Amino acid sequence: MARIAGVNIPTNKRVIIALQYIHGIGAKNAEEIVTKVGIPAERRVNQLTDQEVLQIRETIDRDYVVEGDLRREVAMNIKRLMDLGCYRGLRHRRGLPVRGQRTHTNARTRKGPAKPIAGKKK
């Protein structure tokens, strides 16, 4: 089992699929990494040499923001919006949808479970 960017990569999957287990690397980025390193697309992780794993690791460290750093960066961006007091920051602070979705009937995921209203009993 190869360990890249602090994540255990599954050994029996193709490299492009296995790299997507790293937070911040999707299908396009995984394909790009494999092309840069020069590994055939159908190669599986358990067929990689130590040199190839090292090259993948170096490419990710050099060119991509992944895992904890990415999570921290996103959290800092949201915190910055909230500190600025802009509209998006206020929506984050209140736990409401940020991107203009309606809230009259929907947005239960963002708002949480429905709160009962007193005086609605028969």
Swiss-Prot record:
Give any Pfam family that matches.
Ribosomal_S13
Gene Ontology MF annotations? rRNA binding; structural constituent of ribosome; tRNA binding
The alphabetical list of record keywords is: Ribonucleoprotein, Ribosomal protein, RNA-binding, rRNA-binding, tRNA-binding
A GO CC term assigned to this protein in UniProt:
small ribosomal subunit
Tell me which PROSITE patterns the record gives. Answer: RIBOSOMAL_S13_1 (PS00646), RIBOSOMAL_S13_2 (PS50159)
State the Gene3D superfamilies in the record. Answer: 1.10.8.50, 30s ribosomal protein s13, domain 2
Is-annotated flag, keyword tRNA-binding? yes
Chain segments carrying region Disordered: 95-122
Q: Which GO terms describe its biological process?
A: translation
In terms of InterPro entries, this protein maps to: Rbsml_uS13_C, Ribosomal_uS13, Ribosomal_uS13-like_H2TH, Ribosomal_uS13_bac-type, Ribosomal_uS13_CS
The keyword Ribosomal protein belongs to this UniProt entry's keyword annotation: yes
Family per UniProt?
Belongs to the universal ribosomal protein uS13 family.
Record HAMAP family: Ribosomal_uS13
Subunit structure of this entry? Part of the 30S ribosomal subunit. Forms a loose heterodimer with protein S19. Forms two bridges to the 50S subunit in the 70S ribosome.
What does this protein do, in the record's words?
Answer: Located at the top of the head of the 30S subunit, it contacts several helices of the 16S rRNA. In the 70S ribosome it contacts the 23S rRNA (bridge B1a) and protein L5 of the 50S subunit (bridge B1b), connecting the 2 subunits; these bridges are implicated in subunit movement. Contacts the tRNAs in the A and P-sites.
Official protein name in the record: Small ribosomal subunit protein uS13
Q: Which organism is it from?
A: Xanthobacter autotrophicus (strain ATCC BAA-1158 / Py2)
